[in-house]
Amino acid sequence: MHVKKGDKVKVITGKDKGKSGKVLAAFPKKDRVLIEGINMVKKHTKPSNVNPQGGILNVEAPIHVSNVMLIDPKTGEPTRVGYEVKGDKKVRVAKKSGEVIDK
């Protein structure tokens, strides 16, 4: 998967196209990511011990990883991700600037 938790990404398709946010969680088996403030859905909750009132909450829903692009740390623009072997480590590299993403 080309994005990881903590990456800054931009949504390229869908109802939140053009918005950007930080990846809160990645689900590689499902090819989905959870992004802060993106793809908000209303979740209806029953009253419980934690939330005695119950009600409707706004929460983020995961979106498919193909709908997001990583933001290049050097230029601040969306970029594709490549991989290079540096020493004995495989690192992610921004295609636009050549900047190494993994530190």
UniProtKB/Swiss-Prot annotation:
SUPFAM superfamilies: Translation proteins SH3-like domain. Coiled coil: none annotated. GO terms for molecular function: rRNA binding; structural constituent of ribosome. It comes from the Bacteria. GO terms for biological process: translation. SMART domains: KOW (SM00739). One of its GO terms (cellular component) is cytosolic large ribosomal subunit. Keywords: Ribonucleoprotein, Ribosomal protein, RNA-binding, rRNA-binding. InterPro entries: KOW, Rib_uL2_dom2, Ribosomal_uL24, Ribosomal_uL24_CS, Ribosomal_uL24_KOW, Translation_prot_SH3-like_sf. NCBIfam families: rplX_bact. Part of the 50S ribosomal subunit. Belongs to the universal ribosomal protein uL24 family. One of two assembly initiator proteins, it binds directly to the 5'-end of the 23S rRNA, where it nucleates assembly of the 50S subunit. One of the proteins that surrounds the polypeptide exit tunnel on the outside of the subunit. This is Large ribosomal subunit protein uL24. The lineage of its organism: Bacteria, Bacillati, Bacillota, Bacilli, Bacillales.
